[in-house]
Amino acid sequence: MDDVFYANLVTLQVATPGGAGAGHGQLDPWQLVLDASPVVKIVMLVLVLMSVSCWFIIGGKLVQLLRASAQSARFLHVFWDKAQGSAWTTERLEAVYGKARSLESSPLARVFHAGYVELARVTGDADATQPAQPEVQADLDSVARALHRAANNEVTLLENLLPVLATTGSVAPFIGLFGTVWGVMNSFIGIGNLGNASLAVVAPGIAEALIATAIGLAAAIPAVMAYNYFIRRIRVLESELDAFASDYLNIVRRHFLG
């Protein structure tokens, strides 16, 4: 009889909403954000804006680098066309120049364009007779400067907006930490005003504070990963630009200004 009594009592406690098994309502993260203090809301808004801007930059930069790599590979195929042999003539450079104009997203094509234009200028200014050695060296230096300047411009263009990713990756966690510290401080102020240190009083403020840290990390982690990836891809393209500039300058030296 006692066993039946205790079984019925346990069943009644579980089924009753106000019984011992009933807990307090779960904390809703969205409601915590809405109920956050103005300072924490500003922190969260700044972090969200930083995260959104980073994702736009990541998408645009990814498309830019993929297109640059693909079109640069096509340009190298055109430039080193084996069907043309090893002979370099003005007609061959003109043909490469004509095809390179359609590869507008290729850094290599734009570097070639700069070198081609400078070569045309120095050869057009030369006399019909064979130029003296100092003049040849000056012309080579002029073409080399044009190639170097164009390569630097391409690297600068590829690195555009990457500082935003680097800044977000390094600053966003600290901005989130500031929001966390502010939220925890408000929680302790609330405890002092109420004179009650129960979990129901402390938990909302702590949860609100930790949300700021979570948003900061969510903004920083993708930014750092994308920045490192893009820097690696840009360094590969930069080495390709340097190698092509050296090869093109050797061709100019041997076949046009030798």
Where are these regions (language model features)?
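Transmembrane alpha-helix/interfacial motif
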Residues: 39-81
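Hydrophobic single transmembrane helices highlighted by the model
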Residues: 25-52, 210-214
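Helix-loop-helix
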Residues: 177-211
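Predominantly long cytosolic amphipathic alpha-helical stalk/bundle segments
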Residues: 68-174, 186-198, 225-258
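Hydrophobic alpha-helical transmembrane segments of polytopic membrane proteins
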Residues: 209-223
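Short, strongly hydrophobic alpha-helical membrane anchors
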Residues: 1-35, 196
